[in-house]
Amino acid sequence: NLYQFKNMIEEAATGT
């Protein structure tokens, strides 16, 4: 799902 992928990258961005 595109939403799930977007959520994953957003979570990774938060860890930056």
From Swiss-Prot:
Identify the tissues in which this protein is expressed: Expressed by the venom gland.
Identify its protein family: Belongs to the phospholipase A2 family. Group I subfamily.
The chemistry this enzyme catalyses reads: a 1,2-diacyl-sn-glycero-3-phosphocholine + H2O = a 1-acyl-sn-glycero-3-phosphocholine + a fatty acid + H(+)
GO terms classed as biological process: lipid catabolic process
Disulfide pattern: none
Please give the GO cellular component terms listed in this UniProt entry.
Answer: extracellular region
A GO MF label: metal ion binding
- What are the record keywords, sorted? Calcium, Hydrolase, Lipid degradation, Lipid metabolism, Metal-binding, Secreted, Toxin
Q: What is its main location?
A: secreted
Q: What does this protein do?
A: PLA2 catalyzes the calcium-dependent hydrolysis of the 2-acyl groups in 3-sn-phosphoglycerides. Cytotoxic in Ehrlich ascites carcinoma model in mice and towards human cancer cell line U937 (IC(50)=610 ug/ml). Acts through apoptosis, modulation of PI3K/AKT, MAPKinase pathway and cell cycle regulation.
Q: What is this protein called?
A: Phospholipase A2 BF-CT1
Its localization reads: Secreted
| Cofactor (UniProt) | Ca(2+)
This entry's comment on the bound cofactor is:
Binds 1 Ca(2+) ion.
EC number, as in UniProt? 3.1.1.4
- Additional record remark: Is not lethal to mice up to 4.7 mg/kg by intraperitoneal injection.
